[in-house]
């Protein structure tokens, strides 16, 4: 091809390409920066918070902010319309007992709200949960699992050729859960060599991925499977996980709206009973119908999935390692004592007004729900984890959905081998480095070489 023709071709391709830049971040930012790099303090120590409002990293003058400060979920200092002449403000705070002191700052500029926060940890290693473990807790759950196993798994398996790679075969699978025809659906990813070579049967570690709250489709963990593991990513609602997103949106906003509140007056009626049993039956499926080696089995998830990770590890000793990330459903009853409680904050909103947490009437009329909550509290499952199960915990100090108070308290209850890796500035989401560390920990703990 002549040079002029080649240049013309390049110009044609360039013009034909859509010119669309990515949208990332904001020009305006609200920063709340503690004076300790690790965001940690001892009880009684004073934390200093430096607040900055910037546009393109340059301080904004005469900007108005509102702020709230104090123990997380119970902030007792609130100011509105504070003018920052040079774009900065300094606040101080301290705690007289272990916990998190949280500062929230927000401003509105050109009609848009911007916010920042900082949750400072005060002696978090001393935090202890409030929830009580019922005497029959483990017995109740083991009996429920035994009853469910009287129902055959009766599995189904459908190849998804459009998702398969040269290294991984991908299937949608389902199996019966707690009773006849109540099914759990998921995406199973199996190394292709496992099915091509019978000699490779029962040679692979396995990872069960459990979901966060909501209703959605799932793609399966092809990446981990490509490194030589069986992965099963499950949904919890008894419906296929390969339909169009609109189906799940309609179900979530209709038939399954607020499912986490269902049946809280009785431990046998809670929606989460079939969810937890379904997770254990997913492990049964892995054991009976995949080339799992019977030795290394991980379970992991975030938010609701973090709670389910704790439940699996606590109830099933086939689980050798678990990785809960900003685990929800931990220490439900903490708000009855004026302490930050785990999502979905059952008694923070639904008991007497949360502003009146010191009242002797706190929780009155909620006795049945309080008792049920103890059977569905991640803390009590964590108490069952033994010294042969390795754990990796991660969460953010700015999380306003799953308070770090509950995450630390749950971590402190575990007596087995464990690691903690907080990413302080995260809210209820992941940082890329956090995701990478989680992924690397799972592969290493499952003895998978990259």
Language-model features: locations:
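Short beta-strand/loop motif that positions the catalytic acidic residue
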Residues: 385, 391-395
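Gly/Ser-rich "nucleophile elbow"/oxyanion-hole loop immediately N-terminal to the catalytic nucleophile
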Residues: 197, 201-202, 257-303
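C-terminal catalytic histidine-bearing segment of alpha/beta-hydrolase fold enzymes
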Residues: 401-450
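Proline/serine/threonine-rich low-complexity linkers at boundaries of modular beta-sandwich domains
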Residues: 22-30
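Active-site nucleophile elbow and catalytic-triad environment of alpha/beta-hydrolase enzymes
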Residues: 365-382
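N-terminal cap/lid segment of alpha/beta-hydrolase-fold proteins
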Residues: 35-39, 149-201
